[in-house]
C-alpha cells in the first residue's frame, strides 16, 4: 500500500484500512517492538519502495520521548488525542486492535478529504506498538508536507525514529554536531520543528 497514492490519487483507491490493519496487527504480535511506515518525503529512503519496519526495544530505552508526552482529547468520543508540548503535530489512538484501526481509519480518511492542502503535498508517518502488560495497541499518525523532510537544512531525513525523538546521524558532518556539543535538546526541537506542517495544527483546532 502506498500512502503517497492514497493522499494523491483517489483513482488508485488504495486501502488505508489495510495499511493500518497490517501495521497494527504486526505490532500486536510483537509486543517488545515498535514499527513504522513512512510515506514519500517522510522517511521513505527509496521512492515507491514502501514497507513496514520493526525493531526490538533496547532494554535500557523502554520508551521514546514521544511515548512519554501528554496527549489531550480532540474529539467528542475521546478516542483521538493530540500530543502536547512536542515540536511535531502527532495524533494518537489507543485500545484493542480492531477498535484502533477502525477509529483511526475513519478519522484519517476525513482528515484527508477536508485538508485545505492539495493531496500531492500530503504524506505521513504511521507508528505502532503494543503494551508489554496488556493488549493495548497504540497508533501514531503524523501528517506531513512531503517537501519538508529534513531536520538539518537540506540533510537529515525525518522518518519514524526521528518522529519518536531519536535523531539518526548518518554523516561525519552530523556526527560533528555531537562532537562539538552543538547537538542538544533545543537543537533537536528546532530541527524537528522545521518539518512540522502548519496545516495540521489548524486542522486539530477545527476538529
Where would I find each of the regions flagged by the language model?
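Conserved, mostly hydrophobic/aromatic
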Residues: 51
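Conserved small/polar residues in nucleotide/adenosyl-binding loops
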Residues: 1-6
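Conserved His + Asp/Glu catalytic blocks
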Residues: 9-21, 26-46, 55-207
